Curated annotation (Swiss-Prot):
Transmembrane segments: 10-32
Protein name per UniProt: Photosystem I reaction center subunit XII
Lineage, opening ranks: Bacteria, Bacillati, Cyanobacteriota, Cyanophyceae, Synechococcales
Species this chain originates from: Parasynechococcus marenigrum (strain WH8102)
Listed SUPFAM superfamilies: Subunit XII of photosystem I reaction centre, PsaM
Gene designation per UniProt: psaM
Domain of life: Bacteria
Protein backbone atom coordinates (compact mmCIF):
# COMPACT_ATOMS: atom_id res chain seq x y z
CA UNK A 1 0.00 0.00 0.00
CA UNK A 2 1.69 3.17 -1.20
CA UNK A 3 -1.22 5.46 -0.42
CA UNK A 4 -0.46 8.38 1.89
CA UNK A 5 -3.03 8.59 4.65
CA UNK A 6 -3.86 11.91 6.22
CA UNK A 7 -3.98 12.26 9.98
CA UNK A 8 -7.76 12.59 9.80
CA UNK A 9 -8.13 9.30 7.92
CA UNK A 10 -5.83 7.54 10.39
CA UNK A 11 -7.81 8.96 13.32
CA UNK A 12 -11.13 7.84 11.83
CA UNK A 13 -9.72 4.37 11.14
CA UNK A 14 -8.51 4.08 14.74
CA UNK A 15 -11.87 5.20 16.13
CA UNK A 16 -13.75 2.70 13.95
CA UNK A 17 -11.36 -0.10 14.95
CA UNK A 18 -11.74 0.81 18.63
CA UNK A 19 -15.54 0.76 18.43
CA UNK A 20 -15.46 -2.59 16.62
CA UNK A 21 -13.14 -4.03 19.28
CA UNK A 22 -15.37 -2.79 22.11
CA UNK A 23 -18.51 -4.20 20.47
CA UNK A 24 -16.81 -7.56 19.86
CA UNK A 25 -15.59 -7.66 23.47
CA UNK A 26 -19.04 -6.86 24.88
CA UNK A 27 -20.61 -9.49 22.61
CA UNK A 28 -18.12 -12.16 23.68
CA UNK A 29 -18.67 -11.30 27.36
CA UNK A 30 -22.46 -11.46 27.02
CA UNK A 31 -22.24 -14.80 25.22
CA UNK A 32 -19.79 -16.14 27.83
CA UNK A 33 -22.02 -15.15 30.75
CA UNK A 34 -25.19 -16.45 29.10
Amino acid sequence: MATALTSAEVFVALVVAAHAAVLALRLSISLYEA
